[in-house]
Amino acid sequence: MATKPGIIPSERVTLTRALPFGVPKFMVSTVATGLAKFGEYTKTKDIIIMHSVADIAGLNRVTRSVMWKAAVSVAAMARSDERRVTEVRGRVPVAMSMLGTTTPGALRAIATLERHGFEVVAFHQNGTGGIAMEDMIREGVFRGVLDMNTHEIGDRVVRGLHGAIADYRLESAGAMGLPQVVAPGSAYYTVQGPVDELTENMRGRKMIAHNVHHTLVRL
């Protein structure tokens, strides 16, 4: 468990991120509310964040209550037998990438693989999902990879909203010696911000306003 007062560097959270998927990770923070962004702390890891309510400046009736609940939560997760609910006996785990525009094909692939004894875990290609998938491949979670959506790579080239990926995207399966199928799903567009904030170059292209915050622009 890590505490994260707003003015203290995040080294302790970095240590928490080093733990593999499934190990309970809990962060109590003074900034876990409002407009604070947590991507720099959690990145691709399964970290639970709890607001401290009061400032972390010693123990009192408020901070004791918060810390107690956090400690009990971590202890309960550590003592639970997660495998009873997470492991599907006899199923071979396979990682798959997908996004909205490739959902129909992805669902058919999932149905086919499940009929043949595989358990498919899908990762949303939003700039975090792809690297979360790569990290878990490197942790040895999966036995194969169906990379149906490479949208994040194109978004990285044009600095789209889903382009915050690491250099080892597409490389983990090969590094682990796993079978991998790659398809250029959703590689033909980038996800940008609101229409009225697009650059002149982007405005001259075909586009679809996905919602008020996101615009899909043809590459």
Enumerate the predicted regions with their spans:
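N-terminal glycine-rich phosphate/adenylate-binding segment common to multiple enzyme folds
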Residues: 1-31
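N-terminal small/polar loop signature for handling phosphorylated ligands or for N-terminal nucleophile
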Residues: 131-142
